[in-house]
Amino acid sequence: MSKFVAQFSTKGISFLRFYHMKITIIAGARPNFIKIAPIIHAIQKVQNEGKNIAYRLVHTGQHYDQKMSETFFEELDIPQPDINLGCGGGTQAEQTAHIMIAFEKELESHPCDLVLVVGDVTSTMACSIVAKKLNTKVAHVEAGIRSWDLTMPEEINRMVTDALADVFFTTSEVANTNLLNLGAKPEQIHYVGNVMIDTLKANYSKFRKPDFYDSLKLQEQQYIVLTLHRPANVDEAEKLTMTMHEITNNVHGLPIIFPIHPRTAKVFDELGISAPHLYIVDPLGYLEFNYLVRHCKAVITDSGGITEETTVMGIPCLTLRDNTERPETCTIGTNELIGTNPKEIKPALDKLFSGNWKKGGIPKLWDGHTAERIITVLLDETSELA
């Protein structure tokens, strides 16, 4: 363990001051690494300034992703994880159990002062439970966001994690209010902004064309990007067929680029869904996908994270969901909830093509400096570590 020196306070959260503050950072899937990359960069920056803080990067292995090669980590400019717990596969319950068992051994072998979790994947919840059972502080990045839809596994993960966390890092005033209503103390809540946007802004100049961009003769703002993966949209054959019919028939013949999720690809094959201007492509890397989004006319999606990126890039976003845990993308940004009824797609696309889509703005503190604020809170800039 780190050597004890004295006690200090981080805005109401009491920690012990150590020669080295040790943080364990948890990631379970590719989007988690995209979110923790700027946090690692912020830690490295303060280390270079002489601050005594160390981190250990733990990959639970929750999601196997063929795009997570060595190149992926090089692109994000972060090191490979210190350990991969190898907890992929199985049902949600089995995966939760595997992660908890493996992370308990990891944390007992490598104790720390704080476990930092991000987002709402199963690893976020499972590692938070283990940390608290081992009397270790938990900080949750993207705390307080809620869809209020308990049919979403992610919503359950958020609720459990926020019930256990000691420090909450939030993306919006709505998240702050949610946490206060759920009993969090004001001094535990730190409105810092959105780490996903830190990564987005840091990589603007690195975005690169996918290999197919020129061969398909894509032109700026003259194609649509489509992503679908949620059960509500892809698990019912008739509904999925209707959804694709409404999309393909109402985009004025523009190419539709669909980087397809493996579970969706299987359904498409079974149903034989196709259209002359529908191009189904393999999943893309972070830099290629965001190049595609940055230059498209609009995105049609059922994802949450993409709605944040389109808001900052000023790209119209049509979300095929009945709710969102990121309401600021609708109230401030370029996103609109279309719902899960396929018949609502045509009116939304008519609005887009008539030039009546809202311009949108960027939410407060989504400025590319969120990770720096997170580390400032954890270190407490008014105290110097020995």
Q: Which residues fall in each region the model found?
A:
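Short, Lys/Arg-enriched N-terminal segments with co-localized hydrophobic residues
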Residues: K11-H20
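Active-site and donor-binding regions of nucleotide-sugar-utilizing enzymes
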Residues: T24-A27, N32-G50, F72, N84-K185
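A generic structural motif
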Residues: V46-R56, V251-I256
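N-terminal beta-loop-helix "entrance" segment that forms/cooperates
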Residues: G61-P79
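A nucleotide-sugar donor-handling region in carbohydrate enzymes
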Residues: H63-K67, G86, L164-D235, I338
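Donor-nucleotide binding loops and adjacent catalytic segments primarily
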Residues: E70, R208-H295
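Leloir-type glycosyltransferase catalytic cores
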Residues: F73, V174, E336-A386
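A donor-sugar binding/catalytic signature common to diverse glycosyltransferases
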Residues: V117-V118, I129, F168, L292-C330
